[in-house]
Amino acid sequence: MGIQDRPYYRPDARTPPAYARASGWSATTWIIAICVAVFVIDGFLPWTNEPVASQLMPGASAEQIRQIDRSEFALTKPVDVAPGVARGYAVLGRDNVVAEVEYRKERPLTRIGYFSTARAVYASDPVLGVSGFEVWRFVTFQFLHANLNHVLFNMMTLFFFGGMVENFLGKKRYVAFYLLCGVAGALMYLILNGLAIGGQAAFGPSFHLPGLLFNDPNTMLVGASAGVFGVIMAAAYLAPNATVLLFFVI
């Protein structure tokens, strides 16, 4: 008898191929797999420098700068000045330095997908121009994470609570619910940050109201926390008296 004819080498009709098993994964498993894959892939990609703000040099007028075509500016190569931060200059002509440009070091996937008030809504810079209306960021930021602990605890929590909610809602409604919770989290961040920025614009830098987010509009927001928190609340509503074993033992 050849080795291929032995019983334990024959394909079992009851065992689906790997691709079929993957297509049968739960939505929770898919979300966890995507978040982990994005985190790992992004971690192997090289850092990039993204210009986020400029500071005009003394004597330069923002109104005059805005009237100049941006193609006439040349940005010098940024130089690292602190962990995660680099600086360069905007030059007009051969040696007319008009502004100092601040850069933030980011991974490529994070740069494409992170959420911020400036990127999602609107921001105007005399040197860098207008940005905003990047609505995809309301979804993509949910699949990005800042570090290993961030992705680990979010995915572990989703693993414990996601199955219960998915079984109740079904796969499609569960995915919609999860993503909408993340979008709601981004909208709440946007409202609190927008109110803080608007308050300081109206009443001056001394304006302060507890609960508002006095962050720079370029501050990055990443993570699945809003969607995961929504899943936790749904699980608590569906099974308020359920016992959850932390790490399967406690």
Regions found by a protein language model. Give the residues of each.
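A detector for small-residue-rich transmembrane helices and their helix-helix packing motifs
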Residues: G2-I250
